[in-house]
Structures are given as C-alpha cells and as structure tokens.
Amino acid sequence: LKRCRSKPGCGKFEKLVYGRIPMMVTANCLLNTTGSCLPDNDSTIILTDRYRKDFPVIRICRHCMNIIYNSVPLSLHQNIKEWHGKTDIRLDFTIETGREAIDVLEAFFDRGRLPYDDHTTGHDRRGVE
C-alpha cells in the first residue's frame, strides 16, 4: 500500500474488513447434478463437509452456477483502527439477515459483539507468498 501510493497513477484502495470469502465458483448447478434443480430460484443452500462445517452456497440459476463461500466470515474488527482514515473499508454482506448485518456494523463501529462465534482473519497478518 505504501509503495503504490508513492507511484503516479495508483488509485484509491479499499480494504475488505468483513465478509464471506468465495472459495469456489462451480461451472454447473449443484442441485441440477442431483436432479433437484429449481430453475429461477436463486436461493442459498448449505454444503456440509466431513468435519461438520457448513459452507453457504449461493445459486445463480440464470447461469447455472454456484458460488461456494467459506464456512466462517472474514472479520478484521479487532484491527479496524489500523485502517481508519488510511483507506476506504468495505463490508460485504452475502447471507446475513438484516439483524446480523446491523450487529456486524455495531461490532465494527460501536465496539459491539459479532453475531458469530467463529471468524477468520484470512491472510491479513501472514501475507501470501
């Protein structure tokens, strides 16, 4: 971020501080492969793995595809002061109810509690090689 800001032509940045990270986009409908497709019904379904983790799946029937999201949301609410005023922040809401979205906003800006027991900080501290 510091290196890019010193270069001409580098635009504004935003930091994702909350949201479920897409893990996979399928090229076919998960329900269609089981014979239970509901056309034009962009509903959310849940995949459960062998460790009993639930992965939300958003169906996009128009394109016969799905987006599989991480079982826990990314949340950098504990480090929000690091980014305040340095860049724009973004909170992505995908499967949250209205009440959950309000609770998340309060956790970020009013020091409330997240509506989830578990979350990930992704690669925020570790980086990627």
Question: Locations of the language-model features?
Answer:
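Active-site pocket-lining/capping segments in soluble small-molecule metabolic enzymes
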Residues: 1-129
